[in-house]
Amino acid sequence: MDFVLVAEQLLNGLQFGLMLFLLAAGLTLVFGIMDMINLAHGSLYMVGAYLAAAVSGATGSFGLGLLAAVAGTAVLGMLLELSLLRRLYQRDHLSQVLATFALILMINEGVRMIWGEQPLMLNTPAALSGPVELLPGLLYPAYRLLIIAVGLLVALALWWGVTRTRVGMWVRAGASNRAMAQALGVDIRRLFTLVFGLGAALCALAGGLLGPLLAVQVGMGESILILAFVVIVIGGIGSIRGALVGSLLVGLVDTASRTLLPAALRALASPELASSLGPALASILIYVLMAGVLFWRPQGLFPARR
């Protein structure tokens, strides 16, 4: 296979995986520390994309739109935690699933009332609209390289924050033994609010960065939420390292299989059948990967230390 095509698909997989990491990192922290299943996590990603598109369209500044999306969605996430989700901590997981599913419907309707049914456009910054020549003959969009760089920087910042700071120590203590951490003076309620706000901010960052590549529309968070759950199952619940490894695995497997499978099937079947069957099999491969990890290591590849 052509080297340029392989390199492009690897970069696409890296970019997709790092965007999944932004969603999965917040989700795995909420699930691992707060022991809460939040189905509305994808809705915060959608809100972030809408805020970025709206503010960017009004001001003409992509950076300002992205900043407003991150700040606004973080505040929304903390308000939701304080007003609604805090009441669910002592409930069973079924109650959490039902309540956060209702929250999905409410947020979808709220977005529809504010911005309408039609998708919003979020334009790529003019300075990043062209390609960059990485190697002779290998051109890659500058904006996608920005996404990769931001994803790597966020991953590094999260690792440093969780492992090298006092707040990170509180987060790890809350994940290991909530009652003991509270007995030692950690304000668990405030910690939960901060963690949920951080998860919402990461969702908004992913939504704002992916807005120029995808349609900003109602319901855009549901499909990517499923992939985020797959990531944390593969990587290990509560583990930032696991979320990063799982995201990269899912991103690379999904991107590579969508390119390689149709080409491989054309050698065995008609082009029409290969074109229709290839993408379907590529989607299944992610769940085959998850099933294999669950069979081999039910706790995930890098589970959080308890």
Please tell me what each predicted stretch does.
Residues 1-22, 51, 59-65, 91-96, ...:
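Membrane-interfacial amphipathic/re-entrant helices at transmembrane-helix boundaries
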Residues 16-17, 137-220, 240-245:
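Helix-loop-helix "hairpin" substructures at the membrane interface of multi-pass membrane proteins
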Residues 49-54, 70-76, 103-111, 150-159, ...:
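Hydrophobic core segments of alpha-helical transmembrane domains in multi-pass membrane transport
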